C-alpha cells in the first residue's frame, strides 16, 4: 500500500484495521405514530404479521435480501438477545412502560413463506386487530364502532418502491 513513508516505519503513524460494522441500507415501513390507529401496538404488530417478507423476498428481491430484527443490524448497537448489563439498568425504571416481552424474549420478526405460516400469521393479525377495535366485514377491514374502512397511505421516495406495499392491498 501507499503507507510506507518514514513516519510509519518510525512508528509515529500507526496503521490499524477496523472491521466494517455498517448496517447497510435499511428499507422499512416507518409508521407515523401521531396517527391514532398506529398508536395501538396491536395494530402495528398485526401489520408486521400480515407482511410476508419471505414471499416478497422470493418473488421481488430474487432471494437477495435478509430480514433483520434490529434497526441497528450489523452494529454493536443491534438488538440480539435479552437486555443485560447497562441496557437492563437503563430499561428497568421503564419496565411498566415497555412490553413485558422486552425482558422475557428476544425480538424476532414473524416468519412467513409457507401457506401454513402465512395463514397462522394472518389469523393472529386478525385477532390483534379485533382486540384493537377492527373486524372483517365481507373482505374489508373496518372499525367495529363506525364501520370506517381501515386505510393507510404508504409513501416512498421512488415509484419502484410501490411494489413493496402490495401485500397490504
Locate predicted features:
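Extracytoplasmic/periplasmic ligand-capture domains
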Residues: 1-169
Amino acid at each position: 500500500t501507499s503507507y510506507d513513508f518514514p513516519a510509519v516505519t518510525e512508528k509515529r503513524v500507526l496503521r490499524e484495521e477496523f472491521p466494517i460494522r455498517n448496517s447497510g441500507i435499511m428499507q422499512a415501513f416507518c409508521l407515523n405514530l401521531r396517527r391514532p390507529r398506529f398508536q395501538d401496538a396491536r395494530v402495528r404488530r398485526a401489520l408486521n404479521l400480515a407482511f410476508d417478507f419471505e414471499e416478497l423476498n422470493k418473488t421481488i428481491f430474487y432471494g437477495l435480501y435478509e430480514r433483520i430484527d434490529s434497526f441497528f443490524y450489523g452494529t454493536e448497537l443491534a438488538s440480539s438477545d435479552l437486555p443485560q448489563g447497562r441496557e437492563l439498568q437503563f430499561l428497568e425504571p421503564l419496565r411498566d412502560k415497555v412490553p413485558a416481552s422486552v425482558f422475557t424474549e428476544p425480538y424476532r420478526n414473524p416468519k412467513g413463506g409457507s401457506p401454513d405460516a402465512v395463514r397462522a400469521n394472518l389469523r393472529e393479525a386478525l385477532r390483534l386487530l379485533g382486540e384493537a377495535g377492527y373486524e372483517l366485514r365481507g373482505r374489508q377491514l373496518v372499525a367495529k364502532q363506525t364501520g370506517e374502512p381501515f386505510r393507510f397511505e404508504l409513501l416512498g421516495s421512488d415509484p419502484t418502491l410501490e411494489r413493496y406495499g402490495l401485500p397490504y392491498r
